[in-house]
Structure formats: C-alpha cells, structure tokens
C-alpha cells in the first residue's frame, strides 16, 4: 500500500484469473474394417509351380506404376534416395553391403514345388522383417517357406503358389520360423507338404510375425511396352531399356537402393546364360560369373528375388567382344536351388534381358522372347505389435479339409453394419478349379485319415484395432460349413474367443461338440457374456488448475442403463466430483495441483460394478508478477499492467483475467484486454489497491 499526494499516486492492484467454460468436442471415429478376405489365383501352368499374377485382381494400393507410387507405398519406411535414374547410385548389393546381416543364406528348395514361397517367405519376408526390427538373420530365425507353401499348395504335391497367396497368408495369418516348421526340400513323405501345422498353438504364435502391405510394380513401371489392362505385351513396342541409366529402371533401382529386396518371376529354363567378360572401362570384378543375356521362351516359370544391381557390368549380348550400346548393367538375383548353380546360388540378369525386343544390334533372335524379369513385388513390414491378443480359436476334425469353410462375421451394434472374413485357410479347394480333379483330400495335419486341427484367427483381420473392451461393440457369428454330404463328417470341437490380455476364454459352443456332413452350423455370441469394464477419457490431455476438464466414462459389456460416479483421488483421499447419476460424463475444475487419479465407478442394471482409474497431472496456474509500464504516474495518465503467469492453460485469453481496483474500501472490477493486459487511467489521487 502506498500513500500518494494529490497528483502523484501509488497503487496495489489485484489481478484475478477467471475460468472459461469451453468444453471441447468429442469426435468418435468409426473403425474401418476389412471386408471379405479371400485369396484365389489361377494356375497358369508354370513348371516349377510358380503361378502368374493377374494384375487385374490387384487393388490400387497394391499396384506400383511409377517411382512416385513406390515412394507413397514406402511411407515412413527406409529413406528414399531419389526419384530419377541419374540420382541413383551406380551399384547396390544388399547381399554384401551393410544390409547383408538381414539376408538369409542361399536356400535349396529341392523337389518341393514352392519357389514362390522361398521367394516371398524365406528371402523377402525374412530379410524385410529382420531389417525392420533391426534383428540379424541367423539359421534359426529364418521364416519357413514350408509354412506358407503347405497353406497355399491346394493339397497337391506339385501344387503351385504365387506371391499374393503368400503375402496374404503372412499379412493375415503370420509366419513361423524354421525352428517350428523346418525348411525341408523333399516332398516325401507327402504329409510334410500337406501338414498345416495346426497344433500346439503354432497358429497363434505365427500371428506375431506379419506384414503390413505388399505391392506389385505393374509392367508400366519398368517395361513401357506393356499394357496392364490386358496383361500382355503391346506388339509394336517392347524395348524400354536402352541404357544403364534408363529412367524405366528408376522404380526398381530406387527400391533396391533404399535397402529392399524384390520378388519377381522368370522363365528360368529358357534363360540364355553366358559368362561375364572383361573390357576396358567396365567393372571387371565379376568376370567369369554367369549372366543371363535373354529369356528365349516360356519354360520353367520360377520365383526368385532381386538383391542388387550394377550399372557397370558388361554383358556381351551380341558376342562381338565389343562394348556396344545397351549392353551395360545387370540386376543381381538370388535363387533357391542351392549354391551349386549360378554364382554360388546368385545370378546376374542383364538390363537388356528385360526387353521384349533387345536394344542391342546383332543380339540373338528368340522367336518367343520373354522379359527376363517380370511381376516384381515389394513388401512393407512395420516394427510394431501386429497381434491384437483377441483371437478366434477353432478346433475341427475331418479327413477332408477341402470341404471346410469357416466364416466370422462382426455386426456393429450401433448401425448393424456387417464385416465378414472368410478364413484363409481353411478354404475349399474348389477355389482352385484346375486342381479339383487331381487333389487328394487330407486332414488339417496332412494325413489321409481324420485328424484334428487347432487354428487361431486374429480378430483384427475383421475389425482393426479390436481389443477385449471393444469386442462387445459387435454381435459376432462364426459359421462352419461342410460342403459335401459324403459320409465323411466334420466334427466341430471348439469355437471360442480367447483374450490373451486377461487369459479369458468365451465359449460359443457351451461346452458341446457338433458333427455336420454336407451342412453348416452358425454359432453366435448371443449367449456369451463378455467382461464388464470401463475406461476413462480426460480432455484436454494437458490439465491446468482453474481450467474446466471434461471427464468421460467409456463402458464395455454389462447391461444398460448404467449409473456413473466420478471421484478425484489425491494423496490417499478422495473428493467426490459427481455422485451416481445417469450422465456418462461430467465437467469439473480441478484446483488441486499435482499428481492425482480420476476414479470412475459404473453400475449396470443388474447391480454389477466396475471401476476405472486414470492417473493425471494437474499443473498449477499462478500469477507470479504484475508489472506496470510506469513506475510513477499522475492523475489522467494511462498505465498498462501486464501479468506474468506460469502454467497457463492454452485455451485461456484475456476474458479469463479480472482486475480489481480498491480505494477507500470501495472496489471496482475490470476485465483485461485480449492479450491479458489491463489499461487503467486514475481519475484522482490517493491510496489505491
């Protein structure tokens, strides 16, 4: 307090921080879910069982038609190096550079018709997953090609597969390492290539190892002479690659330079192989190694992976012992026929071999020449937890798994929208019409007699981000179908939801078993009681004293209507914020600074109670100083007062500040301007507070 004369005055001014009632909007985002999830590809007669990919069946997200498409597909993955060929390094070999620690050794598929599985699972997924997680590849953590082969070979000992089947299996069902499913290279005894390994929780274990997405470089991304609408060459063209720095190579080389390995198909029995020669001004480190200069025909369809490229390797395509235009550059590929073939299991494929028509003058003429690299694929693996811990477990017994179909349907209780997944597998082998007449039926364990299969399916394949709390937002149905009435029944032993978080199991069969033959059975959650639980949401996320906070109770399970109670717990004692009421949210100002806990108690109509707790920190808002712009003033002078405040809520502005002027026991209140300051002009002298 100051005493002032008639013209000079002192002051003591009080600034008070007011509160603002500005509740934020609560926005609920409906989860997008996968719709029917099936995989069906036609066998095109590839002799190694590697089937062509029909580009017309790929979604837009699975088609990569340019460097820009690849960049978008890669997202937050490996850093991109550029979008044009001149900006790319002249060579990259992911089997020998710093990424080589993720490469599995050259494998040997032997007599197993599973080249697509060795390409997609053994090489591509092992390398990509381990690189994503930063885990070096060892002989024990390689992912098994037999796991995906047995699930995709249609029950035929010479059954083929292709990339999309393998990638879909890994995306939805996961993968197992060779410790669980050895990478055998003989199809005998036949059970080893028919066994689905549906036992001992292996299917649930596999769900830890999945991929996020896959994409195919459509031919226009690297072969401009192709028309992907009809998936065939355009007769008038077919020579897109004319030099080592040709822009038509940019998409593939960008991916490889970013540390990727790429799956692809080729006709390996039609390769025209020669040896790399030496010449001045070229890379002579690989002289004497095998290089493919062209693909003569359509014999021996085979899946492999591209691991690198080198712009400075010379392939004497026309055999004239001179370096001619179009002869520079080659991709390095890894095969799955052991180290005895090629260059210790690797090969070089000349860039020119990608052309339908060679760019090299005097090149050998092949009447049915084919591109040496085709249907190139890439996969994306994110270092995250893929499994939701909420699964459908189903145990079946049959000698004819080909007749089995299983569907799971989630029906949103709010809007009755349906999300259906056809579990792949088991699937009916009639999906692969070309094998129907020659397939031998087997049990889930690959035997010719009836046997059990214990299978798991992650429910996030149906509803993304599902958990045990949100399971009750949907009505669930599981439909099991036995297609043929042939005297070979299907036994339904278990159908249940399993929650690994709590260890809970919710039986849809009521402890019974069922047998069907040529019919179906639907099981629902109508008689299943899921856990009654609650969660708490507090808004805003950063809380300050004097600020109004919205507290929302989120309830799962139980039977409506509900009663809600809100409390604040601090230092071992509780303060009632709102006694039991019908409102699932309340608005309160929390003036006790420090660490505390919001406690919400919910009762359902049956008297069941659940409690949810939310730890929070309330930041103390405090005015630490009030500074005038003048140390002395006279009556009639304007003085600007500026407050210094710590931990001020972001939503607060000048309307939250109030200033009080007191003189001779009489007080007058004023509001601040928008930037929290107060401008005061005294009309008389004296002592003022």
Predicted regions and their residues:
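Predominantly the structural core of cysteine protease catalytic domains
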Residues: 42-46, 113, 117, 121-125, ...
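Short beta-strand segments within Ig-like beta-sandwich modules, predominantly Fibronectin type-III
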Residues: 576-583, 668-674
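Sec-dependent signal peptide cleavage junction
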Residues: 21-36
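Solvent-exposed segments in extracellular or luminal domains encompassing
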Residues: 582-594, 676-686
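Proline-enriched interdomain boundary motifs that mark the N-terminal boundary
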Residues: 531-538, 621-628
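A short beta-strand segment in extracellular, disulfide-stabilized domains
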Residues: 547-555, 637-647
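Short glycine/proline-centered coil/turn motifs in the loop regions
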Residues: 556-560, 646-653
